[in-house]
Amino acid sequence: MDYQNQKSNENKHGEKLMMKNRSKFVGVRQRASGKWAAEIKDTSKNIRMWLGTYKTAEEAARAYDEAAFLLRGTNTRTNFSTTHSIPTNSPISLKLKNLLHRKSISNLSQSKNQCTLMSSSLQGAPIDNSIMVMENENKSSCSSEESKSLFWVQNQLVSEYNPYGVDMNMMNCSIGITPNTLQIDYSWPLPQQRINELPTLNDSVNVYGMNECYVEGTYESKYEYDVNYPLSHLFCFT
């Protein structure tokens, strides 16, 4: 019971001290030593400045009013009327100017550092060469395929697109064309209907073409190939 009464008395005494130390002025509080401290804050500018300690609460309140007027202008809340002019060379004024100057330099330095960091990161970014590599690979692949395709045409395509087994070398010799001198363009696909139109073999035909003409063995004629069409149409000139 005695312990509870003692604790209650201590709490009441602490509340009295807090009420006594609480100032009626804005930005002023009493320290444990009995002196009054003034401090100003501005959350919009992220500023907190210590104005010093004073013997009386009124002196601390006037210091706060001066700093608030210099920082926020005439629309700020003050403890006393600020109609009188405030000297620009007062200690509080000089202290506040130095604080604002250091703050602006710090902000400018941070912005420059951010710009430099962004610029260096962009300049040092690796260039994606996958597209160029892919293009080069495609070009080399196409080049090799073209070479292979040309070789294959010269060696294989003639027999594949000659379903009737016509001996092209014998035909060339019969019409006076020496081997390896005839250039045939097989780059176009052979239409299916052209294959169906090929004539059937018989004894009376000794030269074969693509539904164009045929020549009996007794006629003297000149023949030449159309190199711009698959399986080279055989044209007759009398």
UniProtKB/Swiss-Prot annotation:
GO terms for biological process: negative regulation of DNA-templated transcription; nodulation. It comes from the Eukaryota. Gene3D superfamilies: AP2/ERF domain. The keyword DNA-binding applies. It is found in: Nucleus. The keyword DNA-binding applies. Keywords: DNA-binding, Nodulation, Nucleus, Transcription, Transcription regulation. Induction: Induced by Nod factors in root hairs. Expressed in roots, root hairs and leaves. Belongs to the AP2/ERF transcription factor family. ERF subfamily. PANTHER family: ETHYLENE-RESPONSIVE TRANSCRIPTION FACTOR RAP2-11, SHN SHINE , DNA BINDING / TRANSCRIPTION FACTOR. Transcription factor involved in symbiotic nodule signaling in response to rhizobial Nod factors (NFs). Binds to the GCC box (NF-responsive box) of ENOD11 promoter. May act as transcriptional repressor of NF-responsive box-containing target gene promoters in root hairs. This is Ethylene-responsive transcription factor ERN3. It comes from Medicago truncatula. The gene is ERN3.
